[in-house]
Amino acid sequence: MRRLVSSAFAATVAVFARRAVVGALVVLTALCVAVEAQAETPLRRPLSFLPAASVLVVTPGAANVVERVMQVSPYLAPQADTLTAHSARAFRRLAARQPDLARCSADTLARLFLVTGEAHIAAALDRERLRRDSLLSANPTDRSAAQALLNTLGWVAASEGTDLYVNLPVDCMINVATPALRCTVDQIREMGRVKYRLSGFPQHGSALRLHLRLPAGVEPDQVFLNGRRLLAPQIERGYLVVDRAWRNNEELYYDLPERKQLFGE
């Protein structure tokens, strides 16, 4: 009798153990699928880069990209990366395959960013910007190198509706003039601090979802809005998102870690 009870008990335990293992596997699989889906899900509507002409570079002296390019030729003009409806579908499919970004051309990276809004793709564009900057420094009269560097101003910011993305660490004034947004964002680096000062809104303010790509070593809870630390900061696709009704001269800032390069990876 005891053997029968023991056998029945052991069988029951085994059944529950199997169910627990299966349940855990189901949950783990669901989590993996959810993470993968999130990483591969394109934006509902693709972004558009703001025109390079809307980015006024204010970096002083020889570090000013526009001044360096104009010394090569005053006739150079930035070339924009855009998407058609057909190419947007193609790049959505490419994004779903999660290509090796290190092997992608700059044009491909730019369009992948427009369909995904992913911060790690913007980081790859920033590395390309630095590479082009180095090429022009090594060949300061090279027209092709100057054109390539000038084109990177078209990657500084992007928008869709009331979403505005600030992607590259360029000291500049970004003049936003789209059907849904009209404002100015001053991106300033001074004394180890990065500031974003917003203005140009109507008197009553305006709704704006501001997406900021933070540098390595800066945590979202280290960002301050109008002098107060952000509470429960929101992260989407690697960007810090500040979604609110903005008024003129409001300001975000964070301090850079010591001995860290801006947006270092």
Predicted segments, located by residue:
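N-terminal secretory signal peptides that target proteins for export/translocation
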Residues: 1-17
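Short strand-edge motifs at loop-to-beta-strand transitions and within beta-strands
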Residues: 238-242
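Short strand-turn-strand beta-turns centered on an Asx-Gly dipeptide
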Residues: 224-228
